[in-house]
Amino acid sequence: MMNKLIGILSIIALIVVVLSIITWNNNMTMEMQNSKNETSITNETSAEKETNTTNETEIVNEANTTSEEEIKSSNSQTGQSQESATVIQPKKGQPIKEFEIVAKESEIEFKQGITLPVWTYGGTVPGTEIRVTEGDYVRVNLTNTLVVPITIHWHGYPVKSEMDGIPGYTQDAVLPGESFTYEFSADYIGTYWYHSHQESSKQVDMGLYGALIVEPKVKPDIDKEFTLIFDEWMEEYEEDMSMSMPNDNTNDTMNMDNESNTSETSGMNENNPEMEEEKMMKELYNIYTVNGKSGELISPLAVNIGDVVKLRFINAGYRSHGIHIPGQVVKIVSTDGQNIMGAEEIKDQIITIAPGERYDVEFVVQSDQSFVIDVHDENLYNDQLKIPVVVDGESDKILVEDITKELLNFDLSGYGSYSEGQFTIDQEYDVEQGIELNSKVDNNKLEYTINGTTFDESQPITIKTGDIIKLTYENKSLVDHPMHLHGHFFQILSKDDIPFTGAPIWKDTLLIKPGEKYVIAFKADNPGNWVQHCHELHHASAGMMQKIIYSDYKSSYTPDPNNTVNKPE
């Protein structure tokens, strides 16, 4: 009996020993894994710090795959002064393109003998080009070394609302010395651009903008491609561009001193405040640039006979420009990043590009004759915007056209292959809103208005996810208003009550000239807090801006009502 008991106890002891060994092995395995994970995080952080130190303006990472856990770890290790809202994550296996952009002061020679101080994204004007491929996950780490708060707005690109870069509305402005990370998925191909939306009329004026190009996965048959960004500069920058009325003598001419505090300005004579302001702006802005260079400093475009050439035009300035590509048979293949079905060949027509707009133009070089892309504008500075196109290196045989010659104006309303668009004039809409664009003088200050009110006073347009919205714009003022809608593409339905008859035209920025009426439609498919505004940014800063709010959306950002730094106009 005793021997039997001893045997049982021996078996129990053996089992205990085995269990102890198993437990010890498991603990060792977990410790080794934890140690490995800590080493991985440490290495990742060290590499990231090294990258941030040595690569301020260039692409710094193109990892093929990154797990969600690594993304969260990376975000937690960046040392950002302001927490960036994480509203999306890369999909498993989604390529990641990461950019480091440092906002910094610099000096740029715009014109021979004229060098000006500028604010830049990455030390150049235009700023660092962000070029990605359809399907990429894009991460842009912005560091602000300027003396002013800034943001980045992705003009025309439907990012999530938290990434839209509107200070005091979707985020706080990025203060000097702080950083912010913008993230979005590159789901829409085309030509876009980015710029600061903090005091944008001043900051874009100072150079805070750059190109955003999303290429298709399947590369088109293009031999040469050029991005051309138009802008205007003041040789002597005016700090106060607040749209105050001109000096006392001009006020006497306009008889403003005896006017009431508030008055509408439409329908007045040539001494109308709007026209006086336009005249003043033309005098102040006296340097016109392409890619930050004017006149003889503009780099020639080198092409060869037979090349398929793509030109991406972006207007980052405050004035519209009439672009002419002389002697070439061209196709306008997209506007505001949106392809035009059945793009037709045209020749020697003026393509008007308004502030904020983009046009992609393609043509085949069919002659060895070098030529100059010029502009047909109503100003004194057309000679500053001549872009040489040198064919087969023949730079001494450039044909220069007469820029005073009258040419046809390109018309989008009947361009491309007709097909029924997503929306029609007569269908039912969930929300219909009239948008009257005008101006008024209030306390001797010129203000630009939407439906009679400025941004601070305006009533938002309230929509909800899934709504179909129709907006009718009427320009009752005497100056152009290129209206820009954030977060959405819209279809143009009609101009001056005449329906569009060509391909469906989709845009995010629309030039509305004095007296014109446009009807557009879009679907509420990007929940968030958005705005629309005039992209003559001086007009936006003077009040022509309006909120568009999704009633079924709750933002992760809560603005501080006591914050006086954020200035979204």
Which residues does each predicted region cover?
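N-terminal, intrinsically disordered, polar/charged segments of Gram-positive cell-envelope systems
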Residues: N27-P90, E239, S244, N249-S266, ...
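Histidine- and aromatic-rich segments of cupredoxin/plastocyanin-like copper-binding domains
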Residues: M163-I166, D172-L175, P273-D411, D497-T501
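Predominantly extracellular/luminal regions of secreted and cell-surface proteins
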Residues: I88-I108, F226-D248, M268-P273, G414-N443
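Acidic-aromatic/histidine active-site loop/patch
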Residues: E225-D307, I314-G317, K440, Y448
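Hydrophobic single-pass membrane-insertion segments
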Residues: S20-Q33, N286
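N-terminal Sec-pathway targeting helices
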Residues: M1-L14
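Histidine- and aromatic-enriched segments that form or immediately flank copper-ligand environments
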Residues: E98, V102-E215, S320-I351, F371-D383, ...
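Low-complexity, Pro/Ser/Thr- and charge-rich linker/hinge segments at domain boundaries
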Residues: P216-F230, E236-E239, D392-Y415, D552-V565
